[in-house]
Amino acid sequence: ACFDDTGLDAARCQVAGPVVGICEAAVHIASMVSNSFSIVTTLNRSVPALEGLVLKYGMERHCRRVRASEVPVLDLEDANSGGRKKIRDEVAKALSEDRSEAIVLGCAGMVDLARDLSEEFQVPVIDGVTSAVKLVESLVSLGLQTSKRNGYAFPRAKTYLGRFQSDQPSG
């Protein structure tokens, strides 16, 4: 899983069951438990893509800012990297400077930070992985599937030609 929800629309075209992105889940849940939130992600290069998703998901009214901690995802696993402190410091800035009421952790690698940060800062800190899993569980329990009318319709079968003709799927 990646917080930029890469391939989400393509996945919805391939399966009938519900498909939920981790950014999508996190920002929607954040908007349900707070009036405003900031996203704290890893690297600055991720910020434009996440700002685009905020717009795509209609959350621009709720999202105060997308912030980068400049912590590469693999540094999150290294206790000596200082990465966790940088993320904690960025969360503190988001709460004071952005005046956000909740924090969305903008990387799947931050999943294990949510509880501690929420307890420390006394605000909801949402991780997208857990959020997406719980939303999918809820959608399944409600008996809901991805609509196959128009936008997320299954792709039409294509006839293979030339050297790939023998690889044509049967059915």
Describe the predicted segments one by one.
Residues L95-A102, G106-V125, E137-N150, K158-G171:
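Extended, histidine- and acidic-residue-enriched regions that form the cofactor-binding/catalytic faces
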Residues A1-Q14, C107-V111:
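Beta-alpha junction/loop-to-helix N-cap segments that form part of ligand/metal-binding clefts
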Residues L43-S46, A68-V73, G109, T130-V133:
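Glycine-rich beta-alpha junction loops
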Residues A11-S34, D116-L135:
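Short, acidic/small-residue loops that bind anionic groups at enzyme active sites
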Residues E51-A108, L113:
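Active-site rim beta-loop-alpha module in soluble metabolic enzymes
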Residues L8-A10, A49-E51, L113-D116:
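Short glycine-/acidic-enriched loop or helix-start segments at secondary-structure transitions
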Residues S31-S69, G82-G83, S138-G171:
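Short, glycine-/small-residue-rich phosphate/pyrophosphate-handling segment
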